[in-house]
Amino acid sequence: MSKTLKKKKHWLSKVQECAVSWAGPPGDLGAEIRGGAERGEFPYLGRLRDEAGGGGGTCCVVSGKAPSPGDVLLEVNGTPVSGLTNRDTLAVIRHFREPIRLKTVKPGKVINKDLRHYLSLQFQKGSIDHKLQQVIRDNLYLRTIPCTTRAPRDGEVPGVDYNFISVEQFKALEESGALLESGTYDGNFYGTPKPPAEPSPFQPDPVDQVLFDNEFDTESQRKRTTSVSKMERMDSSLPEEEEDEDKEAVNGSGSMETREMHSETSDCWMKTVPSYNQTNSSMDFRNYMMRDENLEPLPKNWEMAYTDTGMIYFIDHNTKTTTWLDPRLCKKAKAPEDCEDGELPYGWEKIEDPQYGTYYVDHLNQKTQFENPVEEAKRKKQLGQAEIHSAKTDVERAHFTRDPSQLKGVLVRASLKKSTMGFGFTIIGGDRPDEFLQVKNVLKDGPAAQDGKIAPGDVIVDINGNCVLGHTHADVVQMFQLVPVNQYVNLTLCRGYPLPDDSEDPVVDIVAATPVINGQSLTKGETCMNTQDFKLGAMVLDQNGKSGQILASDRLNGPSESSEQRASLASSGSSQPELVTIPLIKGPKGFGFAIADSPTGQKVKMILDSQWCQGLQKGDIIKEIYHQNVQNLTHLQVVEVLKQFPVGADVPLLILRGGPCSPTKTAKTKTDTKENSGSLETINEPIPQPMPFPPSIIRSGSPKLDPSEVYLKSKTLYEDKPPNTKDLDVFLRKQESGFGFRVLGGDGPDQSIYIGAIIPLGAAEKDGRLRAADELMCIDGIPVKGKSHKQVLDLMTTAARNGHVLLTVRRKIFYGEKQPEDESHQAFSQNGSPRLNRAELPTRSAPQEAYDVTLQRKENEGFGFVILTSKSKPPPGVIPHKIGRVIDGSPADRCGGLKVGDHISAVNGQSIVDLSHDNIVQLIKDAGVTVTLTVVAEEEHHGPPSGTNSARQSPALQHRPMGQAQANHIPGDRIALEGEIGRDVCSSYRHSWSDHKHLAQPDTAVISVVGSRHNQSLGCYPVELERGPRGFGFSLRGGKEYNMGLFILRLAEDGPAIKDGRIHVGDQIVEINGEPTQGITHTRAIELIQAGGNKVLLLLRPGTGLIPDHGDWDTNSPSSSNVIYDEQPPPLPSSHSASTFEESHVPATEDSLTRVQICEKAEELKDTVQEKKSTLNGSQPEMKYQSVHKTMSKKDPPRGSGHGEKSRLKGENGVTRRGRSASPKKSVNRHSEEHLEKIPRPLKSDPKEKSRDRSLSPRKGESKGRLTIKAGSGQDPYRKDRGRSSSPKKQQKIGGNSLSNTEGKLSEAGSRRAAGHPRDSTEQLPDGREKSGVSRKDLKQSQPGKTRTKSPEKKSSKVDETSLPSKKTSSTAGRVVSEKEKGKKPTAGETSRETVEHTQISAKQLKQEAQEKTALGNADDHKGRESEVTDRCRERAGCTPQSSSLVKKAPITPGPWRVPRANKVTGTTGMADKQL
C-alpha cells in the first residue's frame, strides 16, 4: 500500500561469515577481540595471528573469507554478542568447540564500533535494525540495570528492576558519558548505563542466558525495556545515507530489499522480537517517508505507527480510531475514476495468485475483489449509478416501515426448497431496527435462481407467515437455520427498494453477524473462494442455514453486482460492543495476561502467555470474574480477585469487546485481527478513514491465504455430506509426545475412522478443537474412508516425521446443542487455524406469539410440568426456560395450553427471563394453587416427538429418585414441578394392584418407542460431563445384545452427572460423543465413553424416572452392567420409593403409602429376569457359590414383606432395599459402603484384576453369571444374569470361571474376614437347604441364579428378595457357628434339593456378632428377633404367616460347589444359622 522508497544497499548485504579454528595453547584464541559494551562499543576484531610467534596461537580460516581487523563481530556460532562486555564475548567464544563460525560486518555509517550511536538511531519497528537494538539491550541488561528518575511502583525492586535515582544524579551520569542511551518517557528520565568491565561476584554467569535465550523467561526483561524503548531519546537521529549503505525500503511488509543473504541471516534476530512498540507522538519516523515529497507534519493528535509486519498505519487520537490512509496524502490521492490505465488508487494492491488469478486488495476498507477498481469506478461513472444510489438512499431511509401495507413496491411471493447449499441467495441489512433486510445476490443454480421469482434488492417481508420487518439480521438468519434440508419456506418480498450503495454514511454498520460457513467462523483475514457468484458482505445461507460471508467473487456480471462491494473483511462483526465469555485456566505463573486501568474498567493490557487465556485479546474490558461483577473494583482489588484462584482453576471471564477502542499503537498480531470489530468506511469523503482496530492485514493476511486453506474452507459449502454434520480442519504441530490423540476404528472396509481419547496436555488438547468421536475424513489431504487402521497409522507416522498434520474431521451437530460461549470468539491458536464458532441455535420467540396459560391445582397435586433452564447464557432475545415435560392427567396436561418445548417468559406477570433457576421455583411455590404462565409457542416442531411422549405417563410412574426431586436443590438445569410444589403424593400414589398392573404394559410399550431412533435429535438435549475424581458418576443399562436402548441406570451422589443436574435416571442415551447409540452394544457404549478421555458428550432424551427392565424387552437377555464411573455414597437409610420432597407432603399414614409402593414394586419386578438379587445400594455382595440351579415361576410373584414402620426400622438397622431408579435413595450397610467408596472404579478390567473388579460392582449378585449350567435344570444355557459390572466384558467371561478361581476367591474372602470385616452366615433349613446372607465386603464370587416364587400381595418395593422361611422353617432350632467351624462344607446330599433364600444384612447386628466370639449364646435371641421382625412385616403387608406358602422346591442337580468360608454349615443337624 505504501510507496517504495529509494532503495539502497543495507548493511546486512555486507555481512560475511567464516569458520575459524585456533592452533596454539588452550584458551588462546589466535585473534584479538576488542571493544565491548563497557567501552560503549560493539565487539570487533583486532589483529588476527595467522603466523606463529610470540608464543601465541594462530588463527586458521577453515571456510569463508577471512575477516578484516576492525570488522564488527555480530554473532558467534549463531549467538548474538552485540551488547556484551569484552569479557563475556570471550567467554562465549571459548564455550564452543573449534572451528567456530563468526559473523562480521564491515563498519559503516549505521553500524560501526560506536554502540551509543547505533542505539540512538530510529528504525522501523519490525526491521532488522530494530530487532538488533532489542538484542543489544537484552545483552546489556545481563550486566547493567537501567536507571530512572521516577518513583518505584508496586512490586518493583530497586537494584533489580531499576536503579531509582534523582534527576541530579541522572544529569551527572549523562554528562559523564556513563549512559549508553537516555531519554524521557511519561515525564521521567530513563537511561541505560554502561556495564562494568568485570561483573560483581554476586552476578550469575550470563553465558548460558546468552546461549540459550529461548529457554529463559525474558518477560521481566521486556517489562524493564519497555519504557527505555518507548522513551523520547534526547540524541535520536536518522541513519545517515552513504554510497554503499542505504536506508531501509518500506514495501508494505517491513522487509528490506536485500540480496539473497538477507533471508539467510535475518532469522537470528527473530527470537527476540519485542512485544511492545514505539508510542511517543513526537517520533514521526520521517526517515521512512519519501524525502522528495516534502510532506508536512502530521495533523494535530495524529500519529504514525507500524504493525508487527512493518505496515504503516495512522492513529487519530481525536476520534480514537486508526486508518491505513496517510492524512497528509489524502488531498493528493486520486479518485479511482481519475487514475490512468495500469495505475491503482492509493491504498490498493494487486495480487497475482497462481491458483486464483489476479485480484485486488483495498487496504483502506479491508476488502478484496476481482475487478480492477479503476475499471469498476469508470464503469460506474459512465452508468451514473453512484449518483442514483446516493439519491435513493435517503428515500429508502425515510420510508422504512414495519407495516407491510405501507411498503412501496410490488409484493412477490416465493416458495423455496432448502437444498444442501441453502436457499441460494444472500441477504444484507438488518443492522439497525430501522433497516430493511434485502436480498443482496441470487446465487447461480441455487433454489432461488431456479425459482426465478427473487431478485437482488427485494426486501424480505414475511417468512412462513411471520413478519420480519424490523427484525435483526441474526433473527432472520436463525429463522432460515431452523428450516431442515429439503423443506420448503414461504417468502413474501417487496420489490422496489434499491440496495444501499458504498457512498452511504461511513459510520453505518455493515453486517452485524459473525459470518459462519458450515458452523466455522470466517474471520478477518480469511478468504473463501468459490466458483459461484459470491459477493462481498453478503450472508450465504449454507445447508444448515448458517450465514457465511464470502470475501471474494470470481466475476462481476453487471452494474448492480459490481456496486455491491461495500461489506468488507473488517465488517465481519458489529462495531457495537459485545459481551464475550472467555474461559481462563490459571497456570503456574498466573492467567497469562496483564491488566491496566481504563475509563471503562480494567482493560487487558498485554497477553503474556496465551495458552492460559485463549480467546482473550488486548483491549478487552473485564466485566465479571467467575460471575462476580468487578466493574466497580479498583485495579488492586481485581488483581486480588484473580490471585485468590488456585493453580489449575477454570475461571470464566466476562469481557466487553468492540466499540470505540482506546488509542493504541499496539501492532496487533494476526490473532488480534480475528476479533469481531466493525469497519467504518468512506469513499468520497476527503478525510482519513477511521477504523476501530489497528490494521494488520498485509499480503499474507489478506485474501492471499495458502491456496489449500482457501479451498478447504470453501469446499464444504457444496460438498455432499450427511445433514446435521459439519467438517472442520485442524492443524496440529507435533510435540514430543506426539499429536496428542488416539485413533479408533478401521477394523473393516465399511467402518469409519474416529478420533479416540484426547491425551491430556497433548497437542490436540492444547489446540482445543479436536473432539473424541469426531469422524476422521482426511489426513494431510488424503481421504481415509475405507482405509484400515494400520493404513491410517502409517499416514499419521508420515505426518509425525514432517512435524505437523492437517486433519479434516466431521462432527455431528444437532438441535439445541449447547456450545461454550468462549469458543464463539476464540482467537487463533498457535497452530494458525481458527477454532469453531459453535454458536447455539436457539428458537426465536416472537413477542406476538406469547399467550397466557392459567393452571389451577388441587391441594393434593402438583401443577404437572417440568421446566428446563439453559445453563449457558442464551443470546439476546432468547428465553432460556422451556417446558421439558408435561405429566399426564395433571393440571398442565388438562389445560391443553402447554406442550413440551414451549418457552416460559413470565410467571404471574413477572418476567423470568433473567431469573435464576431457584428464583423461578420459589416464584411458582409462592403462587399457591393457581399460577399464570406466559408461554411462547415452540417453533422447532409442532407437538412433542415420540421420544418426548414417553414422559407423558401416569403420576404413579413419575416419581424421581431422592436427591433429585427437590427443585430448589437441583444443581443443574431441570426442575421438576410435577409433584414437588405443594403436592400431596398420597392420592397420586394410591392405586390398587389391578390398576398398577394395567399400567405396566403400556409403560413398556412407550419405552419401546423410546428405544427406536425416531427423529433422535428432536426433543433431546446434550450434556457434556467432565470426569471427576472417581468417574462421570452414572451407570447405564441396555444395549443391542439385550434388544433394548441405552438408559441411565443410576446417578452417583456428588458425581459429575448429578452435579450437572440435567441427567436423570431413566433418560435414554441417544448419542455418545456424537455416535448414535441405535444398534450399538453395551460394550461399544462403554468404549465410546472411555474413548472420550476426561470428557463425554451425551445426547439424552428425557425419560420417566423409571428404568425399562430388560425383562420387559427380552426376558432371556441380561441388560445392565455398571458403567458407573463414580460410585455414589449412600443417602440416609430411611429412604423410600417416593422422593424425600414428596414424602414431606404425605398426610396419610405410612402404611397406605407403603402398601401402594409394595404393589408398584412388585409389578415393576414382575416380568424381569429371573436372576434378580438383593441389592445393597448398588453394591451387591456376591454369594459364594459355583453352580446352583434356580428356577423362577413367572406366574407366582415372590413373597415379600410390608413397609410400614417395621420396614423403616429395618432401614435404620442397615437393611438395604432396592429401588428401581437406582438413585441415591437406597439405604445401605454403612461399613461396607464406606469400604466400597474408597475403591476407585476402573473403566476396563485387566484380566489379572478381574476378581478385584468384580468386588467393586455395586450389584454383583446381578452381574455374575452362573459358573456351571446343568442340563435339565430348566434354565436357558445361553442366558446371562443381569449385571452392572464396571467391566464391559465381564458378563461374557464369568460363566467360564474355574473351580480354582473360585477357591482363590474364597480364600481371599476368608482372609478379608480375618481382618475384621463383617461375616457372612448361612441359614440352613432342616431339609438341608441353606439361607445365605452376605456382607457387602465380600464381593469376590459370582452369585448363582435363584428360584423365586412370586405372590403379588407379598412383593416389597424396597427389598429385592427377602424370602422368609415358613413356620416350619422359622420354628426350627438353630445355632450360630463359631469362627472355627467356618471351613466346613456341606455334602452333596445336603445341597441337592436346596433353595437358597436371601435375607438382608443388618450392619449393626453384624458388628455385634463380630465382636461376640461366642455365638451359641446369642443364636436364639437373633433368631427370635428376626422372626419377630418378619412377622410384623408380614402383618404390615396385609398377609399372615398362614398365607405364606412353603417355598416351592425345585430339583437341584448336585454339583461340586463350595460354600464360602463366611457361611457356616453345621453338619447334618438341619438347623439354619441366621445372618444378623
From Swiss-Prot:
**One Gene Ontology cellular component annotation held by this UniProt entry:** nucleus
What tissues contain this protein? Widely expressed. Colocalizes with TGFA in neurons in the cortex and dentate gyrus, as well as in ependymal cells and some astrocytes (at protein level). Present in lens epithelium.
Q: Give residue ranges for domain PDZ.
A: 18-108, 413-495, 581-657, 729-811, 852-939, 1022-1104
Q: Where is the composition biased (Pro residues)?
A: 193-204
What terms describe the molecular function in GO for this protein? ATP binding; frizzled binding
Instruction: Give the start-end ranges of region Interaction with LPAR2 and GRIN2B.
Output: 852-939
Instruction: Describe its membrane topology.
Output: Peripheral membrane protein
The protein's role, per its UniProt record: Acts as a scaffolding protein at cell-cell junctions, thereby regulating various cellular and signaling processes. Cooperates with PTEN to modulate the kinase activity of AKT1. Its interaction with PTPRB and tyrosine phosphorylated proteins suggests that it may link receptor tyrosine phosphatase with its substrates at the plasma membrane. In polarized epithelial cells, involved in efficient trafficking of TGFA to the cell surface. Regulates the ability of LPAR2 to activate ERK and RhoA pathways. Regulates the JNK signaling cascade via its interaction with FZD4 and VANGL2.
What's the protein called, per UniProt? Answer: Membrane-associated guanylate kinase, WW and PDZ domain-containing protein 3
Q: Which organism is it from?
A: Mus musculus
